[in-house]
Amino acid sequence: MITPRNIFRHELIGLSVRIARSVHRDIQGISGRVVDETRNTLRIEMDDGREITVPKGIAVFHFRTPQGELVEIDGRALVARPEERIKKKFRKP
């Protein structure tokens, strides 16, 4: 089960996401569903069907868990290959 405390250790593909803040104002506010993830990027399918590739390190993301909880994550914390990030140890707040 994905919770705000363990979202780093789970797959992000399929989650709803919105770009809350970004260095690039053009992508701020974009929302959709994560369809792919690489070491440095998230590929987001927007509501109109278009896909956009967003660098993780330049944005703050709002993810919605399957239970409906909203989680804010600084993209710099996500920069890693998904399989490495899932194994990585994170300090609990």
From Swiss-Prot:
GO cellular component, one term: ribonuclease P complex
Listed name of the protein: Ribonuclease P protein component 1
GO MF annotation, one: ribonuclease P activity
Organism: Methanothermobacter thermautotrophicus (strain ATCC 29096 / DSM 1053 / JCM 10044 / NBRC 100330 / Delta H) (Methanobacterium thermoautotrophicum)
Function as written in the Swiss-Prot or TrEMBL entry: Part of ribonuclease P, a protein complex that generates mature tRNA molecules by cleaving their 5'-ends.
Leader sequence residues: none
Reaction equation(s) it catalyzes: Endonucleolytic cleavage of RNA, removing 5'-extranucleotides from tRNA precursor
Gene Ontology biological-process annotations: tRNA 5'-leader removal
Induction: Constitutively expressed (at protein level).
Subunit structure: Consists of a catalytic RNA component and at least 4-5 protein subunits.
Family: Belongs to the eukaryotic/archaeal RNase P protein component 1 family.
Enzyme class name: hydrolase
Main location, first listed in the record: cytoplasm
Enzyme Commission number: 3.1.26.5
Nuclease in keyword set: yes
Swiss-Prot/TrEMBL keywords: Cytoplasm, Endonuclease, Hydrolase, Nuclease, tRNA processing
Gene: rnp1
Compartments, as annotated in UniProt: Cytoplasm
Listed transmembrane segments: none
